[in-house]
């Protein structure tokens, strides 16, 4: 079986085009364009690349993008003060603080300081709690982006045995909640899981997010499984690969995401969706 490639680039562009049309309609109706504040502390090269892609995406869909590039020496108190200012700014619908933060700054304290109605990354305990209670509002971007991919490819997830490899707060844990909403029987594996291969071999839907190149061999994949590879790993030769051995897995799967060009573009597209949602649902005069 040769797997069908799930083209995240194309779907992400569709999502961004849909958002752009809605923004144009808002502005034509006399409403303001949504605003996103992107905060970067320090000069981590990978973070700078991620932030640049998010800013570019904002501008392409017609958002107001405001950048805050702070030095590595920024204190936690200074960062929290900036977040307080942005929370009170009526022209800003979403606040994104790029992780990781420098040593000495508490990630949890910073993320919890962002107002839940401006938490477009979906990391605030309020938004994670809403997802757990089956009443989601602003949803974590990567898991929601994966669900969008499955929906756009008309993949029926109800009744599937889904296995998530990795239990991070950013992907694994919220992904398990999204899969429950999508009707899956869901297993989350982690570093203490015994006999990982057995879990993988029984997965109708496999989502891998561990950040280790080639972590899941292709021969572990169940025939006809749907494989979603969240990993983005750069090898010494410069090649970017996922957590799954792609060629071998693609020979057994029914659908598979490539790396790059699979899940990654959907994370940014969902951030854009979340920002528009925050603007419309929370911050418009007629919003809830």
Curated annotation (Swiss-Prot):
One of its GO terms (molecular function) is methylenetetrahydrofolate dehydrogenase (NADP+) activity. Its EC number is 1.5.1.5, 3.5.4.9. One of its GO terms (cellular component) is cytosol. It comes from the Bacteria. Gene3D superfamilies: Leucine Dehydrogenase, chain A, domain 1, NAD(P)-binding Rossmann-like Domain. Pathway: One-carbon metabolism; tetrahydrofolate interconversion. The keyword Hydrolase applies. InterPro entries: Aminoacid_DH-like_N_sf, NAD(P)-bd_dom_sf, THF_DH/CycHdrlase, THF_DH/CycHdrlase_cat_dom, THF_DH/CycHdrlase_CS, THF_DH/CycHdrlase_NAD-bd_dom. It catalyses: (6R)-5,10-methylene-5,6,7,8-tetrahydrofolate + NADP(+) = (6R)-5,10-methenyltetrahydrofolate + NADPH; (6R)-5,10-methenyltetrahydrofolate + H2O = (6R)-10-formyltetrahydrofolate + H(+). Keywords: Amino-acid biosynthesis, Histidine biosynthesis, Hydrolase, Methionine biosynthesis, Multifunctional enzyme, NADP, One-carbon metabolism, Oxidoreductase, Purine biosynthesis. CDD domains: NAD_bind_m-THF_DH_Cyclohyd (cd01080). NADP(+) binds at residues 166-168, 232. One of its GO terms (biological process) is L-histidine biosynthetic process. Catalyzes the oxidation of 5,10-methylenetetrahydrofolate to 5,10-methenyltetrahydrofolate and then the hydrolysis of 5,10-methenyltetrahydrofolate to 10-formyltetrahydrofolate. Homodimer. Belongs to the tetrahydrofolate dehydrogenase/cyclohydrolase family. This is Bifunctional protein FolD. It comes from Citrobacter koseri (strain ATCC BAA-895 / CDC 4225-83 / SGSC4696).
């Amino acid at each position: 079986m040769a797997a069908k490639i799930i083209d995240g680039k194309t779907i992400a562009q569709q999502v961004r085009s849909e958002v752009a049309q809605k923004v144009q309609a808002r502005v034509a109706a006399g409403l303001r364009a949504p605003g996103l504040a992107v905060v970067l502390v320090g000069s981590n090269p990978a973070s700078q690349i991620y932030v640049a892609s998010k800013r570019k995406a904002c501008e392409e869909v017609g958002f107001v993008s405001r950048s805050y590039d702070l030095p590595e020496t920024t204190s936690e108190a200074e960062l929290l003060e900036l977040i307080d200012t942005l929370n009170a700014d009526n022209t800003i619908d979403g606040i994104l603080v790029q992780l990781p933060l420098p040593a000495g700054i508490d990630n949890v304290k910073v993320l919890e300081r962002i107002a839940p109605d401006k938490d477009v990354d979906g990391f605030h305990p309020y938004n994670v709690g809403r997802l757990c209670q089956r009443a989601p509002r602003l949803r974590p971007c990567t898991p929601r982006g994966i669900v969008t991919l499955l929906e756009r490819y008309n993949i029926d997830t109800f009744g599937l045995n889904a296995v998530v490899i990795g239990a991070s707060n950013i992907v694994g844990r919220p992904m398990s909640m999204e899969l429950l909403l999508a009707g899956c029987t869901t297993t989350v594996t982690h570093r203490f899981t015994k006999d990982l291969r057995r879990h993988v071999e029984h997965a109708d839907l496999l989502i891998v997010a561990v950040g280790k190149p080639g972590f899941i061999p292709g021969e572990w994949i169940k025939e006809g499984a749907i494989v979603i590879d969240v990993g983005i790993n750069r090898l010494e030769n410069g090649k970017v690969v996922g957590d799954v051995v792609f060629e071998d897995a693609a020979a057994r799967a029914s659908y598979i995401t490539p790396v790059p060009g699979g899940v990654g573009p959907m994370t940014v597209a969902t951030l854009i969706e979340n920002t528009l949602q925050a603007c419309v649902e929370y911050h418009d005069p007629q919003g809830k």
